[in-house]
Every structure is written in structure tokens, then in C-alpha cells.
Amino acid sequence: MSGKPQSPENQARQLIVAYQQYQAEAESLVRELGLIQMTAEGLDKAISAIGALSKAAEGQEMLVPIGSGSFAYAKLSSADRVVVNVGGGVSIEKPAEEAMEMLRARRSAISESSKKINEALAKIEQEMARIQAALERLERELQKQGGSEGFVQ
């Protein structure tokens, strides 16, 4: 590659490619944030449910969700122990308070991940705005030179 400056058209092409790459990365991060939000909501529900169970009496009849908005009647046999997923498809029985602490720690980690992804997304959006402005400048420059059909996103 020579030291010769690039033409505005080539600069624009490179900027458009970079913009599209940032756009794809931003879309991926938004999808990841959606998954994180669903996980956070599930953790919040589990923490709330364990809290509610701790106030229930053993033998108390309750409705247990079985999916698709359906419930089954059940009697609580133990309010102080729950079964929690510890990862890798493995679930273990834990004291309710210990399970709540474990779930709160997961929730905290999820919140931190969400914060980092939002920060990365903000940086990408800033870079996309910078590229957009550069493309607009190049487009004006090309129009002054008398030949552009426009390429700003």
C-alpha cells in the first residue's frame, strides 16, 4: 500500500464496512442483554419464592407452577430446604437461606455482566455515531466535487 491518501469513495467504503461490523456487534450485545434480563428475572422469582416459602407452614397446601400458566396443588413438606441448580445440569438440596444467598450472588454477577455489556454497547454506539458523522462529511465533500449518489446509512 502506498503513502498516497485514499480517495473519499474508498474512505467511505471502509467506514461503511466498519459501521456494519459495529452494528452487528451491537445487535449481538442487545440479544445477550435480553438473555441476561430473562436470567435475572428468573433469579428474582426464585429468590422471592424462597422468601415466600420461608413464611409458609409445613403441610400448607399451595399451587405450584408446572409451566404454560398451569399449576398443580401440592403440600409443603419442608419450608427450610430447597433444591437449586448448581450448574452443568446438577441440582442439589440446600438450606433455604443458603440457597437464597447463592441466588443473590448469581443475581449480583448477572447485574455486573449487564452493566459491562451496557458500557460496551454505549462505546459501540458512540463509535457508530462518529462513523456516521465522518460519512456525512465525506458525502458533502463528494457532492462538492460533483459526483455522489449518497451513501450515508
Curated annotation (Swiss-Prot):
CDD domains listed in its UniProt record: Prefoldin_alpha_GimC
Cross-referenced HAMAP family: PfdA
Protein name: Prefoldin subunit alpha
Subunit structure: Heterohexamer of two alpha and four beta subunits.
Domain of life of the native organism: Archaea
A Pfam family: Prefoldin
Main location as per UniProt: cytoplasm
One GO biological process term: protein folding
Family matches, as SUPFAM superfamilies: Prefoldin
Function noted in UniProt: Molecular chaperone capable of stabilizing a range of proteins. Seems to fulfill an ATP-independent, HSP70-like function in archaeal de novo protein folding.
PANTHER family: PREFOLDIN SUBUNIT 5, PREFOLDIN SUBUNIT ALPHA 2
Cellular localisation: Cytoplasm
A cellular component term, taken from the record's GO annotations: prefoldin complex
Keywords on record: Chaperone, Cytoplasm
Family as reported in the entry's similarity comment: Belongs to the prefoldin subunit alpha family.
Recorded GO MF terms: unfolded protein binding
Organism: Methanothrix thermoacetophila (strain DSM 6194 / JCM 14653 / NBRC 101360 / PT) (Methanosaeta thermophila)
Gene behind this protein: pfdA
Record flagged with keyword Cytoplasm: yes
